[in-house]
C-alpha cells in the first residue's frame, strides 16, 4: 500500500531535497556529444510524432540515419523538430534532459557523408536499408538537471 500525505499525495521521504537546475549551453552540448540515443519529435501531417533515433553530434549539428521509405524520411525536407536526450535514475529520482530545437535537412555533401559513414556511433539499432542521413541544425539548446543540493 502506498503511504499518502494528508493532502492525498504519495509521501516522499526526500522529494523536497531535490530541485531543477538549468544547464549551461556548453554542458548541454557536452551531454549531447557523450550520448547517442535520443527521441526526435515533429508535427507530421496528421499527428505529432516522436521516435527514437541513434544520433551523433558532428560540427555542431545532430545527425541520424533512416531508411528512405520510413516515416523519419519525411524529415529530409526542412522541418522544425526537437531532439530530446536524457538520462534518468528512477531509484534516486535524479537525472537530466536536453532538448535541441532545430531544422532538418538531408545530408548530401560528400565530405559530410564520408565522415558520417565512418562513425561507429551512428549505427542504427534496427537492421535495414538506412542510407538516408538527416541533419538537425540547432536553433536552440536547453537542458536541466534534477538532483539533490550539493
Predicted regions and their residues:
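Short, surface-exposed beta-strand-loop junctions and turns on beta-sheet-rich folds
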Residues: 46, 70-72, 150
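A short mixed-secondary-structure module that forms the rim of ligand-binding clefts
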Residues: 54-90
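A generic local structural motif
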Residues: 24-27, 49-51, 68-69, 120-122
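Short, surface-exposed beta-edge/turn micro-motifs
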Residues: 35-38, 52, 59, 78-80, ...
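Charged, gly/pro-rich active-site loop segments
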Residues: 2-20, 82, 87-150
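Short, basic/aromatic recognition patches
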Residues: 13-39
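Short beta-strand segments
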Residues: 35-67
Amino acid at each position: 500500500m502506498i503511504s499518502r500525505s494528508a493532502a492525498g499525495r504519495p509521501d516522499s521521504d526526500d522529494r523536497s531535497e531535490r530541485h531543477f537546475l538549468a544547464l549551461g549551453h556548453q554542458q548541454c552540448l557536452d551531454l549531447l556529444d557523450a550520448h547517442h540515443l535520443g527521441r526526435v519529435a515533429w508535427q507530421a501531417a496528421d499527428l505529432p510524432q516522436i521516435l527514437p533515433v541513434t544520433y551523433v553530434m558532428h560540427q555542431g549539428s545532430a545527425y541520424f540515419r533512416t531508411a528512405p521509405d520510413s516515416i523519419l524520411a519525411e524529415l529530409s525536407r526542412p522541418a522544425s523538430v526537437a531532439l530530446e536526450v536524457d538520462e534518468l535514475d528512477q531509484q534516486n529520482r535524479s537525472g537530466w534532459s536536453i532538448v535541441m530545437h532545430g531544422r532538418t535537412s538531408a545530408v548530401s555533401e560528400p565530405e559530410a557523408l564520408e565522415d558520417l559513414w565512418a562513425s561507429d556511433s551512428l549505427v542504427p539499432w534496427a537492421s535495414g536499408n538506412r542510407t538516408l542521413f538527416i541533419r538537425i541544425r540547432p536553433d536552440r539548446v536547453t537542458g536541466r538537471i534534477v538532483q539533490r543540493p550539493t
